[in-house]
């Protein structure tokens, strides 16, 4: 009986000594098979010519949606002189637009997050030693963003700037003047539609979900396009999930096999939901827009405070056939 008990315990815990190795493998996912699959997909993307839109080259390794594929396609199309990136709002950097770029293409970069726990987590990973990565802990504001960028000591023309802070994105991007990225990736809020120049009002300590519904944040695609046009960029489209917009510096547009598009042409309504009813059931289609009805926004054309007109946005998206469900 005792012998059987010993055998049972031994079999039950025979892998206990391997736990450190398993944890190490999971943590160091730059060695994982998904990276190898991403490398194969990236190689295939090099031969994709005459694509109709960015969705044709999407694939996901570490990005939240298909942005890894879009980025790989763009850096193969464009003669980017400085292989550098800046991304903020990365949390622990496990899911990010530039992580695969860092690992696969050996770019150098700066990542910024407002949580010291997240930044310490990044610095504890082997990729922080194996690759040229800087991680800075700071809650980004209009007054500190340029100094944070300057501290990275990159040339003014960096390769990619990725802006995703779930809130003051428009105001922070507007403030940045220390770098001129070849590619700008900026999160937009599709619930504002494509016609309205809307953004949330700037607030230094804005935290998504604190004062308003979780789905009320960021800016409209129209506002992001207007802002980047003034900075010398052309809009080439959005990812198919409907949360990231892509802008290319005008000097580099000629190298692309796809054209600049209008807000209406490039707009994508978000496929995911970040809005719920009182019972916690996810809202879909037009109900996501109605969840932010009459909330205060800034019209980036006039600078005036307006109120979200959900029905006007819904009507324009229906007319343009931009919604899969109503």
Where are these regions (language model features)?
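Short, hinge-like loop/turn segments at secondary-structure boundaries
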Residues: 127-130, 152, 179, 202-204, ...
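Short, structured coil segments at secondary-structure junctions
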Residues: 104-105, 179-180, 231
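Conserved beta-strand signature within the Rossmann-like core of class I S-adenosyl-L-methionine
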Residues: 181-192
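A short, conserved alpha-helix within the catalytic core of class I
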Residues: 167-180
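Rossmann-like AdoMet/SAM-dependent catalytic core
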Residues: 28-79, 83-86, 94, 148-149, ...
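SAM cofactor-binding core of SAM-dependent methyltransferases
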Residues: 55-163, 190-193, 276-281, 285-288
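Conserved hydrophobic/aromatic beta-strand scaffold that supports enzyme active sites
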Residues: 160, 183-185, 244-248
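N-terminal auxiliary segments of SAM/dcSAM-dependent transferases
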Residues: 7-43
């Amino acid at each position: 009986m005792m012998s059987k008990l010993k055998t049972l315990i031994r079999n039950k815990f025979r892998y206990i000594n391997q736990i450190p190795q398993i944890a190490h493998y999971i943590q160091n996912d730059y060695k994982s098979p998904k990276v190898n699959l991403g490398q194969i997909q990236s190689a295939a993307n090099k031969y994709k010519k005459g694509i109709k839109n960015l969705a044709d080259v999407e694939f996901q390794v570490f990005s939240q949606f298909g942005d890894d594929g879009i980025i790989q396609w763009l850096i193969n199309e464009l003669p980017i002189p400085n292989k550098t990136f800046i991304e903020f709002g990365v949390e622990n950097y496990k899911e990010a637009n530039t992580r695969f770029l860092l690992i696969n293409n050996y770019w150098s970069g700066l990542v910024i997050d407002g949580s010291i726990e997240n930044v310490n987590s990044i610095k504890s990973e082997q990729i922080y030693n194996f690759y040229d990565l800087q991680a800075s802990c700071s809650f980004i504001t209009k007054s500190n963003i340029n100094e944070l960028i300057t501290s990275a000591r990159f040339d003014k023309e960096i390769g990619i700037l990725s802006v995703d802070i779930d809130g003051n994105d428009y105001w922070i991007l507007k403030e940045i003047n220390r770098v001129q990225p070849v590619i700008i990736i900026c999160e937009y809020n599709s619930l504002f539609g494509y016609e309205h120049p809307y953004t949330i009002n700037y607030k230094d300590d804005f935290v998504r979900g604190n004062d308003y519904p979780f789905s009320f944040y960021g800016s409209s695609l129209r506002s992001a396009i207007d802002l980047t046009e003034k900075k010398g960029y052309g809009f080439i489209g959005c990812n198919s999930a409907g949360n990231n917009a892509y802008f290319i510096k005008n000097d580099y547009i000629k190298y692309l096999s796809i054209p600049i598009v209008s807000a209406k042409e490039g707009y994508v309504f978000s496929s995911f939901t970040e809005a719920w009813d009182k019972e916690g059931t996810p809202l879909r289609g037009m109900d996501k827009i109605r969840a932010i009805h009459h909330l205060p926004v800034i019209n980036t054309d006039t600078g005036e405070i307006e109120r979200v007109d959900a029905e006007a946005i819904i009507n324009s998206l229906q007319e343009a056939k931009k919604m899969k469900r109503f």
